[in-house]
């Protein structure tokens, strides 16, 4: 037999065969398309055109306006959702270097005091807004964090309210009541009610813009009350405010000011009472920048106040960071607050929460958290600061559960009992407290909750040095205005003014600049020029008093003496038309 060739056959065909195949393929595709058209497989659905509103419709203009309003509202909701997505993306990227942080790296050392001054000015502005809220309010609600009520109290705020007058009444509001066990909530309410009226509250965590839910304190199933995102305690708080307006027979609306430290839930409280998102809220402290007025109804008006950060801690900045009074991104040293967290929390809980192996020190803990969460710098180095910010964020968000217990009071210190008895008549407290017990009983116990108990922090006070600096800055500004008006002083007065200006940085720079050789001092030149002008004018006035006759030529020369000497050389007096011709 003849062996078959191992070479591959050629794929070359004649042109007749090639065009025959192409024709058959074309006919096949044509037939398939025809069958699909008959069955209607690839037919596009017919878009029905909107006929619009007929012209004969009597309310066409009103309907068109309503459509425009709905369209604008839909666009606004889309923009708000975009902003919410951006905020969530920022939270996910927590710990990375922000744009503002990169800007500060490029700044010089001379620019750093300016940044500090801007921050101080904003804190002073918040303090002024607090004073306004206290002056305008009839009832002041101080919002406290139920996890650490004593640590989120500010005694200076309470003192300001008490000194504002006898018509100002302070009420303590224990917010975030769902984050603590039942035993701690009951003891804290008893402790605080010995000084002022205190109300328990849980803000709504729903995300829709309106119709936020409330849960009544008279619910049939108290065990299911805290499993929802609805608001709790709103009916008791409104009843408290209505009782006050009835007891004083106020015909006008009652103004309620809401004060407290940053991120205790002041804006969330207003949204929960209004049952709509009327005020911006967020987990970052300092979101509210100015006083905001919200009308709850025709009888109650709410005033939202920015959280005051002019605080003086008994310990260090780490304790203020753990109370979420400062932004985590702005902390210079985020590791030191994490050291405090490791002292308070057991290691087993942190190991199970972050799913890391056992650790020994703070650096080891942060190193393992950074490797698990993927926080790395350039070159594969572990970012310790980013891991510390993650832990701080979890602490402030409540992912690391903790609570405190109230301290024991001294037996002799019951000076506030008179205040409580007087306020009990105004607010009808017994009736309000009776309706509150149902949802407090629905809180989880210590065994069910299993949080970390930590020692209670002391109350915070204002930094008095910053308040004193504010009064000093006002006096310095007045002195600067006076020095600007007195530019014409000469000799010794000019040297004294120079000494006062040298205190500022710009004054010192100007002194060095004008002290150099071949440097023109414009201010000194202006002062000398004015001095010469005054001297010439005084001499001319003396000559006028001596001469009785008035001479127009002499008077014209006197007026020209006030001008620059450069323009007086060979200057002729235009007397044509004034004197008779000879």
From Swiss-Prot:
Bias type Acidic residues, positions: 476-496
GO cellular component, one term: nucleolus
Region Basic, annotated ranges: 2-49
Segments passing through the bilayer: none
GO BP terms in the entry: cotyledon development; floral organ morphogenesis; maintenance of inflorescence meristem identity; negative regulation of DNA-templated transcription; regulation of embryonic development; regulation of epidermal cell differentiation; regulation of leaf development
Residues spanned by motif Nuclear localization signal 4: 522-529
Positions of region (Acidic): 463-551
Disulphide linkage map: none
Annotated motif Nuclear localization signal 2, positions: 22-29
Source organism, top-level taxon: Eukaryota
Binding sites annotated in the UniProt record for GTP: 175-178, 263-268, 304-307
Region described as G5: 202-204
G2: annotated span: 286-290
Known tissue expression: Mostly expressed in flowers, siliques and inflorescence apex, and, to a lower extent, in stems and leaves.
Region G3: start-end pairs: 304-307
Skewed-composition ranges (Basic and acidic residues): 497-506
Domain description: The basic domain (B) allows nucleolar localization in the absence of GTP. The intermediate domain (I) inhibits nucleolar localization by the B domain and is required for exit from the nucleolus. Exit from the nucleolus to the nucleoplasm requires both the I and the acidic (A) domains, and may be triggered by GTP hydrolysis. In contrast to other GTP-binding proteins, this family is characterized by a circular permutation of the GTPase motifs described by a G4-G1-G3 pattern.
Protein name: Guanine nucleotide-binding protein-like NSN1
Source organism (scientific name): Arabidopsis thaliana (Mouse-ear cress)
Organism taxonomic ancestry: Eukaryota, Viridiplantae, Streptophyta, Embryophyta, Tracheophyta
Gene, per the UniProt record: NSN1
